[in-house]
Amino acid sequence: MPVTLKDIAERANVTSATVSMVINNKPHISEETREKVLAIAQELNYYPNAIARGLATRKANAIGVIVPNLASSYVVRILQGIKSTNRDIDYTVQLFDTIGQKETETQLFQRLARERRIDGAILIGSVVSEKELKVFRDESVPCIVVARKCDILDSVFVNNTQGSIEATDYLIKLKKGNIACAVCYKKNLPMEERLEGYKLSLKRHGVSFDENLIFEVSDDTMAEGEALFSKIIESPTKPSAVFVPAGDMVAIGIIKMAKRTDMRVPDDFAVVGYDDLPAAEVIEPALTTVRQPKLEMGDHAINLIIDKIEGRETAFKHKELLTKFIVRDSA
């Protein structure tokens, strides 16, 4: 027997009219009531039939932007690109922070899509695997992945491999000896591509790859870089330079610790980062780094998702942007 509004109302201890208002995304309903009604509707399997059919033609005039960490400077710059687009848009941009939890990311998108609270979604730095991203493809709401290439969804990304090749080439040409590489152990495609670029550069220059020169951090923070510095310096491989695909904040932490130990950067120890965050220019010495076109990524993403929503772009589209190697004083 089909589930009715009355069934949901009785379980939620509200009126059928209230349930109808929630399902149709009407205002003047408390968030607590809305969440309770929607949870019961989902529990009773109401979404796949009545809600989906009833709301299929309704627009929310909203674009959901799902991020893994709203405190990240990298994410903030992409968001600035989304917000500063030259295009006049009739959509509200809604931000959702999943704090890097892939289950939350998937469940959040499903809920927003099925409740028709968004017309499209932008995933920035998604931690979900390609297999799991099928969930996003199977919903009726268009979705774009930013900062990583994705074969099953539209994506806007940078050529991470080439960026790492340029950075490693530069350090090799400085004849700095062993070059350490600091990566983030949170395995994802961009980080794997950056590590691959490091390896390719070594190979092209006839330098053997040494696993002992790979160091891992848990996140792109200054504290992680400070903690990593002693591990690099005390390593039997004795590196005299480090390339930091993990990000600029780790590189800055390394520079700070080097200065505290009276090690001269870049004379005694060269440091190259990845991202070109605003802090890269402020640190002394200023950080040599790989610049990612974060504003451009955001701008391309918002324009592409609008074209998808409004039916102007139907084919899969993958936009690759190039990095730029920025030489400053740390290497």
Regions found by a protein language model. Give the residues of each.
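Short beta-strand segments enriched in small/hydrophobic residues
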Residues: 18-21, 55-71, 81, 170, ...
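Short acidic capping loops at alpha-helix termini that bridge into adjacent secondary structure
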Residues: 177-178, 209-213, 265-270
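Flexible loop/turn connectors
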Residues: 230-331
